[in-house]
Swiss-Prot record:
Amino-acid positions noted as binding Zn(2+) in the UniProt annotation, renumbered to this chain: H17, H40, H42
Subunit description: Homohexamer formed of two homotrimers in a head to head fashion.
Active site location: C36 (proton acceptor), H81 (charge relay system), E124 (charge relay system)
Reaction catalysed by this enzyme: 7,8-dihydroneopterin 3'-triphosphate = 6-pyruvoyl-5,6,7,8-tetrahydropterin + triphosphate + H(+)
Family designation: Belongs to the PTPS family.
Protein name: 6-pyruvoyl tetrahydrobiopterin synthase
Biological pathway: Cofactor biosynthesis; tetrahydrobiopterin biosynthesis; tetrahydrobiopterin from 7,8-dihydroneopterin triphosphate: step 1/3
Species of provenance: Dictyostelium discoideum
PANTHER family reported in the protein's UniProt record: 6-PYRUVOYL TETRAHYDROBIOPTERIN SYNTHASE, PYRUVOYL TETRAHYDROBIOPTERIN SYNTHASE
Length: 135
């Protein structure tokens, strides 16, 4: 009988951004986003969890090295040491909140991990994080 496990890989990336919506006035942006309308950066902690049945013959359902390579290609190379609004074409015109960033990362990973992708968790700070499960 195979058992289902959840495997999580953690990565850290540094990105800069500002929270600003072109759909709002400057005053509305200031009211909603406060000082975050100015450019600033974060050392984001990303945790990607995949879920699957352990294969008896190999004792795992996915080699962690494969997950690490997918994360590097689909996420880290795009976001690490980048300005999210200026350097990531797919994020143009999107307010780069942690919520939207978690959805973006899910969308980048889903084609490669669709049978296994369970959760994307991003810690913006030690106390603030977002979890997205594809819903």
């Amino acid at each position: 009988m195979s058992r289902t496990v959840i495997l999580t890989r953690r990565e850290v990336f540094s990105s800069s951004h500002r929270l600003y919506s072109d759909k709002l006035s400057l005053e509305e942006n200031k009211k909603i986003y406060g000082k975050c309308i100015n450019s600033h950066g974060h050392n984001y902690v990303l945790e990607v969890s995949i879920k699957g049945a352990v294969k008896e013959d190999i004792g795992m359902f996915m080699n962690i090295t494969e997950l690490k390579e997918i994360l590097k290609e689909k996420v880290m190379d795009k976001l690490d040491h980048k300005n999210l609004e200026n350097d990531v074409p797919e994020l143009k015109g999107i307010v780069t909140t942690t919520e939207n960033l978690s959805i973006f990362i899910w969308d980048q990973l889903f084609p490669s991990l669709k049978d296994f992708l369970y959760e994307v968790k991003i810690l913006e700070t030690e106390n603030n994080f977002v979890v997205y499960r594809g819903e």
